Every structure is written in C-alpha cells, then in structure tokens.
Regions:
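Short proline/glycine-enriched turn/loop motifs at strand-loop junctions of beta-rich domains
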Residues: 350-356
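Sec/Tat signal peptide C-region and signal peptidase I cleavage site
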Residues: 18-22
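Short beta-strand segments of immunoglobulin-like
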Residues: 334-339
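Short, surface-exposed polybasic-aromatic patches that bind anionic ligands, especially phosphate groups
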Residues: 23-324
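Bacterial N-terminal signal peptides
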Residues: 7-16
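C-terminal edge beta-strand
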Residues: 392-400
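Solvent-exposed segments in extracellular or luminal domains encompassing
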Residues: 364, 369-382, 388
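Structural beta-strand segments of beta-rich domains
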Residues: 343-347
C-alpha cells in the first residue's frame, strides 16, 4: 500500500452502501473507551463468545501449566492512570462519520487488509500520551457500519494517512476467519478488541466473552480461533497460539472485590485465549480512569495452578495447515465506467466463497455485492475477496472526464 495516493472520503459518499443493519452497532456511545451499551461483537457462536465452562480439559493441561509455572500469577495489564508516562491497557475509539484514509504498510502488508479505513488522525495509540516504540495498537470501531479496524505498530502521518506494520478489519456482525497462517494486528491472527476486559462491561456486571492473554513462550503452532503462530520455544509443552485456559469451577471467587470478581467469573465461563508472546498470564483490558487499581491488583493472588487448559483440538503446525480454494471472482464491473466528476458509479461483483470484501481506494470494507461511489478523478479500483484459504483480487478502471 505504500505509495498510494492519499484519499479522504467524506462519510456521506459511503453511507448509502456501507451502513450496517439497524439491529447492530447504532446504540454504541462515541469516543475513547466508550460504552457499547450492551452490544456484543460477533455472533453468539463465535469462539470469543462461547461458554466453555463444560468443555473437556486437555490431557496435557497439568504439564502445560507446569511449563508456564504453577505459581505464575494472573496479572491485569490495564488499569486507571499512567505508569511511566503511559496509560495502562489498549485503548479503543468508537467513531461516526470519520473520513476514510489510506493505510501504508511497513512490514506485513501481504497478510493485512488494505485500506482505506476510518482512522481519525488523533486516534489513541496504545501507551498514549507517550506510546514510545511498543506495540502501538490502534483500535477503531465504526458505529455507522459496524466494522472494527485494528492496526499494529501505528504511526500517524501529516497528510492524515497512517503507517502500520499490519492491519485487519473485522465484521462485527459475522464470524470471520483470517486466512490460515496470516497474522492480524495480533500475533495469533485474532482480533485484539474482542479479548479486552472493558470497564463498560465490568460496570454492567458481566463480561460476556473470553479475554486475551499472553505467555512468554509459545510453540510454532496454532489452534482455532487463531490463524498464525509466532513460535519461540521447542518445548513440547509450550502453548500454541489460540490455546484457551479457564479458571477452575471450584476456585472460590466470593471474597474478591467487585471488579476482580466480574473478571474472574468471565474466566470461569469463557476463559482466556492466548494471543501473543509476552509476559506470562497477563490479561489485557482498556485504559480507563474508572478502574479501581486496588481492586484489580487482587487478581495477582490467582496462580496459574488455579487454571486448566481447555482441549486443544485441532492443532495446526507447518505440516498440516488446512488448504482449500480462495474466493472465485466471476466478475467485477463499473457502471458506467466513464463519468463526469461527481457522477455516481456502481461497482458490482459476483464472487463465490468469500468471507468478507474490501474495495480500494475510497471504499474500504463492505458487505453485499455492489457499492456506489462518486469519483472526482480517474482511478483503478481493486476488489479484495478473502476467506480462510487466501485472497483473490480483481480490478476495474473508472475514467472521469
């Protein structure tokens, strides 16, 4: 994507064909760490939202936890205020009418979803107000269209575009599997936002999804819902990306303070999914000054030995990654293909086997089989159709006289 012309697309040009169904995201509040007001990303059968409290235990559970370290404490990697000049946690921003801008890829563009994306120039970067050189995640939820946009190693540019090592788009209304062996804005190929412990949920009394966590060591393998590995250990009991752990049902959480108790209840019902290499047993949440840090600190009394590993099945390694056909694009057309500046053009496509679509430039992630644009200059549009086995593309040129 580096070198593409920068585009700012007014929201009114896109709303007619990008708007999400009425039952979706419209109730979200706007802004940083905004409340989703009960909206739960992704369908109820999505891996993040599944009740795994009765799922079978992996036969190697004890050995895996012993490798992690039985006494390794759970650690909330989020909270109120700042530490060393940085906020604690991964921020997110809920936007409406935000201009779509170009994303320039600096590392993993071949495994990323192309722009444009509605990333505000002042979107909070992980670690703000002094994000430094860490992971620098940027998470943006588009309330108008119900898409989630996630960037890794993100740097805003003076012209309004963003540089990022990688990026992924997520349809908040549907299940989406990234292509096997592809990364995302997270090492495991997962959504970062999906696994955050958010203050708005805890304040409501329940977290209704699994949490994201990290371990110091991982094997060169992944298990669903992950799609990517980042192995740094050959130990047979190192965890694969996507491994899920849950707090044992017998573990007494009744004496924990309210915020910690709500988090621990979620870890019993939904568990936590390994998403990246990092400090062991660190769970991720959003930075919010309404967190009670003393309350959250009680989570550190919970040892890894209080958890169990949910059955790892299937397990994918470089020798058995699933293969299959990428989407088949039968046609991608522009009608009309020659217009005067500002006149509408309908881009239409006939595709089989795709999980989601992106049209670039100007449009971004889109549902359905057509989109109407109002180009101001001649451009070649690219359709990207993606599924679990790869991505297919097609192009069409629109001439503006």
């Amino acid at each position: 994507m580096r070198g593409l012309q920068f585009l700012l697309v007014p929201a009114f040009c896109l709303s007619a064909f990008l708007s999400a169904p009425a039952q979706s995201c419209s109730g979200m509040s706007l802004g940083r760490e905004a409340s989703l007001n009960g909206f739960i990303p992704f369908p109820s059968d999505n891996a993040w939202n599944q009740d795994i409290s009765s799922a079978p235990v992996d036969p190697n559970s004890s050995a895996i936890i012993n490798f992690i370290g039985d006494s390794t404490p759970l650690h909330p990697d989020f909270g109120a205020g700042e530490y060393a000049g940085q906020t604690m946690g991964i921020p997110y921003d809920v936007v409406s009418g935000s201009p779509f801008v170009t994303i320039n890829f600096t590392a993993y563009g071949s495994e990323s979803d192309p722009g444009p994306m509605p990333i505000p120039k002042n979107a909070p970067i992980e670690g703000y107000p002094n994000p430094g050189s860490g992971d620098r995640h940027v998470l943006v939820l588009d309330r108008d269209n119900c898409w989630l946009y996630e960037l890794y190693s993100s740097y805003p540019q003076k012209n309004g575009s963003w540089d990022a090592a990688s990026a992924a788009v997520w349809d908040l209304l549907n299940d989406e599997q990234r292509p096997y062996t592809w990364t995302s804005a997270d090492a495991a190929g997962l959504s970062v936002f999906a696994g955050l412990a958010r203050y708005d949920e805890v304040a409501s009394g329940a977290i209704q999804h699994a949490l994201r966590f990290t371990l110091q060591n991982s094997e060169n393998a992944f298990t669903p819902p992950a799609s990517h590995w980042a192995g740094n250990s050959t130990d047979p009991y190192a965890a694969p990306m996507g491994m899920r752990m849950r707090l044992q049902a017998s573990y007494d959480i009744s004496s924990f303070p309210p915020q910690a108790q709500t988090i621990l209840a979620a870890l019993k019902k939904y568990g936590m999914i390994m998403a990246d290499n990092g400090s062991s047993m660190f769970i991720t949440g959003d930075p919010d000054n309404r967190w009670n840090n003393n309350d959250l600190a009680t989570l550190k009394s919970v040892p890894a030995s209080a958890f169990e590993v949910v059955l790892i099945d299937p397990l994918y390694t470089p020798t058995n990654v699933p293969t299959g056909p990428a989407p088949v694009i039968g046609s991608f057309t522009a009608n009309p293909s020659t217009v005067s500046a500002g006149e509408p053009v309908t881009l239409s496509w006939n595709v089989s086997g795709a999980s989601y679509f992106v049209v670039s430039p100007q449009v971004g992630a889109v549902r359905g089989s057509s989109v109407t644009i109002t180009p101001t200059k001649s451009a070649t549009y690219t359709l990207y159709g993606t599924n679990a086995y790869g991505r297919s593309t097609a192009t069409v040129k629109v001439t503006v006289q």
